[in-house]
Amino acid sequence: MSESIATLIPLEAVDPVLIERLLDRAFGEDRHARTAYRIRAGMDWLPQLSFAALDADEMLVGTLQCWPIALRDPAGRPVPLVMVGPVAVVPERQSEGFGQGLMSAMLDAEARLAQPNQAALAQVLIGDASYYGRWGFSAAPTGGWRCPGPYDPARLLARGANLAAMPAEGMLGPWEG
């Protein structure tokens, strides 16, 4: 993590208007049309796995949100997953380690929340394998998964101890369990 990060805080401590402004700056105001938004439509982000990065001047420079979603197998049975993202950093502060710090905070929180003798839920995201691979995300388990909108299959990445038990085929969408 960069020395630039002064503080990682729970995302729920940040004004939602500031979060939306940061996301617009990082991804553009048309970001709501992206497939990731369709996958998590109608869901509230998971506060225990969502964080904000403040720089040394206590300015908001990054956010990470996680969402409850499901992979529905061909028979329609839902399997719960956590969708990671967006991982957003303001453009002028990218490549300073803020995204890495946010990912590390989320994975640490996920490990603390894990139940004894039970694997944590698998995580999925749409992103660059070269970046997210350092945390074990891979496109290998998602080859038969589909999304409700356009996406590059090489960018649909997943990680988790229980991926072998996941359906090989299915559609990602909001958790409705």
List the predicted regions and their residue ranges.
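Conserved acetyl-CoA-binding loop-helix of GNAT-fold acetyltransferases
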Residues: 84, 89, 95-108
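Conserved GNAT acetyl-CoA-binding A-motif
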Residues: 101-103, 108-127
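Conserved beta-strand in the GNAT
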Residues: 50-52, 59-72, 80-88
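Short amphipathic alpha-helix that is part of the acyltransferase structural core
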Residues: 1-38, 45-61, 163-177
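Conserved active-site alpha-helix within GNAT-family acetyltransferase domains
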Residues: 116-117, 123-152
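Short, solvent-exposed loop/turn elements at beta->coil junctions and helix N-caps
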Residues: 36-42, 143-146
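Non-DNA-binding regulatory cores of transcription-related proteins
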Residues: 141-159, 166-177
